[in-house]
């Protein structure tokens, strides 16, 4: 941070520090930068979080209100914003007091009140439901206050997803040419970019018909009550009706075709091998791309026109139409992007994964279509590498298996003039400070042996807890299912376990720190997100337990399509996909232990494949050099498996 600030000041640029997720972002914003301000008093910094992390003051006022008139107004605006019970209303009233008195900045992560996801979804908003400058609360809105601060800040803390969205829309952040961009935990960037560019949309025929009918009525309302100066040709009722009718017929045809690929009347998924659509489906997608883009343009034209009429019309009626048109624009934008991507055979020189899903909610069937590129190097080149002059990508795991090749393939980065790939030696003496322990497990951590393996793991873990050699411990799992199984085996130790999901991560870490500093034993238990950005030094963390080598899931449509493509190129998917990803994960997990010259301890890895498989040695060679020990494991008898088998057999008989 300090060199970045110095260079940014010298070059008169804005330093943007981006990290992998909101938790790491908030750590820099709430802890690291306030600490730096003590030695750089005039430092101006802020954070750029996504809109969904901020409270919407309009929604908060409605949910905190007990006034019927407020609810009547929101009903007219088509917003169902009423508290479910008195406790919710009181909580919202308290939050409003905190916001109004500046005790809270409106960011979900910065309140000590527990807000469940259901309530927060109504307290926050999204782009489609935001009135923007037309909102009565615009000036004091936490989201827009934070956005205005960005223009004055020297340092902006962001996350990769927000940076990608900002570069795509050319909004939020200063101009790319005026940035010094640092991408921390940069190994996540290709995956984040791929997720950001994934397009999904509902295409259920009856639902689509309803949306088109509502849009036609909305356009008619605009033409009648808020007529623009020049009438768009597509706003002509007959032309718009014909346009929407053609669009619906294509959607209905697509539904019929997709239903042939999926078992009738139940939840299902169909992936198109290598992303290759039948010719008939490809032609439908190409036509849908054109038709939805025209509706997107019409909605955008009306929205811009409506935004200029706020001073000359009934504000409540206008706001209602603005909200509805904004939501219509959001829908047609998504549809247009989806069908454009579906119409492509390749993106960044690789296939586009395409699949359809059918889900059943409340007895109703919904059909969705999804597209995502396997590679996003062209998009990263356009949005980042070519547009921002100075970028630093950092991470403990830019290399996997001691090579930059996976990063280069996924990100499109190459050794060009002025670009450098640098691997720095660790300043720590791992041989003296720690060791790796691979217990002599009887079972490999495969799905068929999961119950026995976790029972063995729990027995060894219990032995370590009872030895009382370590105050601070961390247990990392590859899946939530395995974590919950483990917790069933150690119910008597539950009070000392701080488990992911019990509270927000930063609160669990604070509680862990307090416990250890007061001489109590404390164990953090979590998934892969706990393996990154967790900085606990010395006695705060002296033993890390790793459930198994974390290979990526093999049932993802993207992973399966990439595997097909690699095989078509005579490449081995395990070598290109699975092993580098597992190496990334293992390096991050092991890296939690030694964080300073005063750190010490052990990393326990419950996976004997590190010693028995050929790839195990390669994974170990990519780690810091620790001594390796192989102690025995207490013998355990697993009875649960037999019971489960009996139950399953009983179910089959019925």
Feature locations, PLM:
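Conserved RecA-like P-loop NTPase helicase motor core
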Residues: 439-451, 502-611
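Conserved interdomain hinge at the start of the Helicase C-terminal
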Residues: 382, 439-478
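Signature of the SF2 helicase/ATPase Hel1-core->accessory helical subdomain module
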Residues: 23-26, 30-34, 127-128, 134-155, ...
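A contiguous, basic/glycine-rich beta-loop/short-helix subdomain that forms a polymer-engagement track
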Residues: 121-154, 164-173, 301-442, 453, ...
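N-terminal targeting/trafficking signals and adjacent low-complexity tails
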Residues: 604-654
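Conserved helicase motor "Helicase C" RecA-like lobe of SF1/SF2 P-loop NTPases
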Residues: 478-502
